[in-house]
Amino acid sequence: TDIKKAEAALIRRFQEEVSRFWDMEITSLSPIDTLSENMDIPLWNRLLKCLKNIAAERYDGILILHGTDTLAYTANLLSLLFAGTSIPILLISSNYPLEDRRANGYANFKGAVEAVGRGLPPNIYVCYRNRDGKTYLHLGSRLTQCPPGSDEFFSAGLPCFGEVSSSRLRLYQR
């Protein structure tokens, strides 16, 4: 399936690169395989059930591959239902298919893994690289939908929570 191919490509590329966290153990689950524009209540419930069944104490963080069309909705939903999570839960997406050279999906995946590896505090986040080349961490509860005609994400009412790169995790808010 497309989601399995994307997962494999992201993990393979990350492990091939030089990263302090290249050997991080990654467990993959695929409770949903649909375009995010097709998300509905039964699919969100399937995702929620999967997340509730994960033994959080076994993991440093959870990464959720998600489409951009309903990314802000899912991030806000998870922020409400998983408030008080004991580990960081990050949603990542790509503005284009991963094969497209303009795609930011790998940067978003890498940023999320780097953030978890560098001790990102528990919460719900979206890790997303905008056109300025910076990979931002947004609180899931603050993420807004992309402005019309744009593929960039922003935080409502506040600057983003932080920024992540291969060399550091910079948190603007605590």
Segments the model singles out, each with a brief description of its role:
Residues T1-R174:
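Active-site histidine-anchored catalytic micro-motif
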